[in-house]
Amino acid sequence: MTRFKIVKDVFRSLEWNRRRNVLTGMIFVFLMCVVHSAPNALGREQAGGACEKRKGLVILVEFPDIAPAVDEAFVRDRFKKLDFYVREMSYGKVCTDVDITGWHRLPDSVKRYAISPANLQVDKSRVERLIRNAVNAADEKNDFLRYSFVVLFLGAAFKEYGMVGLCGYPGMLGWKEDVVLRTPKGQIVPGGVAIFTYQAHLGTLFHDIAHVWGGVRGGQRVLPCLYDHDIQARHPTSDAGFAEALINMGYWDPLSCHFYKRNIPPPGISSWTKLRLGWIPEEKVRVVDPKEESEVVLGPLEDGSSETLVIKIRLSESTYYLIENRQPIGNFDRHLPGKGVLIMYADDRIGECRHGASPVRLMNADPAVPYLQGAAFDPPGKELFVDKKNKIEIRIVERIGDSYRVRISNGKCVKP
């Protein structure tokens, strides 16, 4: 497949409603970017450098009672889009490539593998059986040591399987670091396993594969779901009010929302997620002392050329604030509920989003807007955040193009 065809496919997938003459010019520009191995101008500091490739094996799974609704070309296109997304989110540092097997028919009907759409109500034995049957079917013709993650791509629809996508490990089957899955030939299945129906959105693909890439550290998932699991149990799907579970990060990160709207690409990921994946260079993280006054020009998180991508205010060994700037630029942050400065409180002691607790949570600039869609701070009127307990004041002093000058006070003027 030519690079020109790849770029055309990417544009079509993102459903850009451009006029034909504008589109022609942009295809040429992006073609040149691809030819020179730079994902786009926003990640130009990575231009010329090789990306860290995440190689995956996609096992196509069919069931005896239903015919696959898609073909291999459809699946390949989905993962081509994932690569495009990952390159932009990592500023060109990381890319992904997959090998796709032929269709493997499992011994049981899809009903025997079907699960609940609510995470806390999933029959784990069914997930384990699906993974083992699919991996065993692919054992003979595939060398699993060549890959860092495995995907089961089902020829079934969401309503037939019960969940549009999930992470088997580290996820539904737990996240013990000593878990080892072996094939009948004795091959070790590396990394982890994600499962998707063919209707999975690009944001869902990233969400569950990111769980695998994050892995397990200190007995915790590095990248957990950022929606509340207990609320999701009561509102498991979009039709059942899934947005109610978005109490931590709203629609500002696909680890929380998967996507903002079904018919558009997912939003970009937050600085918290990028930091946990190791996708933000250390020199672009400005660490400030909350006891001293600091001013920082904060560039857009989507623009990898920004001198500062995130501000970190450490409160203790495990707690801190992150400040990022989200602007409608690039291919994905244009699909956000708003724009401005996001302020997040993080607590590394918290592993999962349960019972109202979360390892990261947005401070909400406008609580009157539901589902944290008004969380961004942006002048006029929403330029100040105050933490009275820790005596910290965060103020947007001015806007400079797409950047902001942000002042972090020492708290002397903040009354408890």
List each language-model region with its residue ranges.
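Non-catalytic C-terminal accessory/binding modules of secreted extracellular proteins
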Residues: 47-49, 55-62, 67-73, 88-105, ...
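Extracellular hydrolytic enzyme modules, especially secreted metalloproteases
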Residues: 144, 156-332
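Bacterial N-terminal signal peptides
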Residues: 24-34
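Boundary at the C-terminal end of the N-terminal hydrophobic targeting segment
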Residues: 37-43
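Divalent cation-coordinating acidic motifs and surrounding scaffolds
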Residues: 73-75, 79-134, 177-179, 199-200, ...
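Aromatic-lined ligand-binding clefts that engage carbohydrates, nucleic acids, or primary amines
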Residues: 153
